[in-house]
Amino acid sequence: MTSENSIHNALYLGFNRSQWAELRESVPLTLNEPELADLRGINEKLSLTEVTDIYLPLSRLLNLIVGAKQKRGLVLNEFLGRKPPKRPYIISIAGSVAVGKSTTARILQALLSQWPEHPRVDLVTTDGFLYPLAELKRRGLLQRKGFPESYDMKMLVEFISNVKAGNEHVKSPLYSHISYDRIKSDYQAIEQPDILIIEGLNVLQSGQDSAVGIQQPFVSDFVDFSIYVDAEEQLLKKWYIDRFLQFRGGAFSDEKSYFHHYSNLADNEAKTIAANIWDSINGPNLKLNIEPTRDRAHLILQKGYDHLMSQVLLRK
């Protein structure tokens, strides 16, 4: 039987930290410590060294790839004799709950927007495309929130299709982690960006994963470059529990929070509840739906202890 390592060796070029860091070349570090502090996720210790060693080489790679796509578009439009439509380059970032997808997305947005070739970089999370809380309850999906069936896929695909087509003023629904629900009558307007980053649990899912066996368009069909943020499950579970404890004294303390009833839990109670949530929801979703899509990514960022990147895999 072919091992996972041999599959990775066939599909990907592997780089350790020092090898990857060398590929930065002369790309300058444009972030300072206060700016980085605003981009960090809960319970993450992201340093400027991590940005320099991991994210600057990735920023350089993406800039080269986006530039090549833009040049190809110019050639095609010249051949067709048409005015080039403004269509964004779409980057997706997938991975488990608590792996740090949102931080990766924010860092890349900040770095990519510094390149003169593509100054406008928008970021959208798929959380806004979860069915509203009332609809999840009606469908009996509240305990499967984050699973593929808990998303309004028709709305999500229509959104990314309109963005990819170069349409102006495309609306993306917003999500509140306080109310644990989609925000009514509010949205993020996407106005023909140079690059769109879309971040979510299931953005690498394809028609092959359809439960009904019918081929249909998915987010991955519209993506130009995909990134998967990876880590061992024991680390993911630990990070989830640590984050839950942080939220208990932070967001959960807000009386409007859907999880306010967790705010006064003792440490042991909070850890037990968080572990149960992982074992019953997040862990199964990871194994069934998220992790199986990993090897579809163009690039895999593998994290080790303390959220530090240990290896980068780049598809050949």
From Swiss-Prot:
Organism classification: Bacteria, Pseudomonadati, Pseudomonadota, Gammaproteobacteria, Alteromonadales
EC number: 2.7.1.33
Sequence positions that bind ATP: G95, S96, V97, A98, V99, G100, K101, S102
Entry protein name: Pantothenate kinase
Main subcellular location of this protein, as a coarse class: cytoplasm
Entry keyword Cell cycle: no
Subcellular location: Cytoplasm
GO-annotated molecular function: ATP binding; pantothenate kinase activity
Keywords per UniProt: ATP-binding, Coenzyme A biosynthesis, Cytoplasm, Kinase, Nucleotide-binding, Transferase
Catalytic activity: (R)-pantothenate + ATP = (R)-4'-phosphopantothenate + ADP + H(+)
One cellular component term from this protein's GO annotations in UniProt: cytoplasm
Pathway the protein takes part in: Cofactor biosynthesis; coenzyme A biosynthesis; CoA from (R)-pantothenate: step 1/5
One Pfam family this sequence matches: PRK
Sequence similarity: Belongs to the prokaryotic pantothenate kinase family.
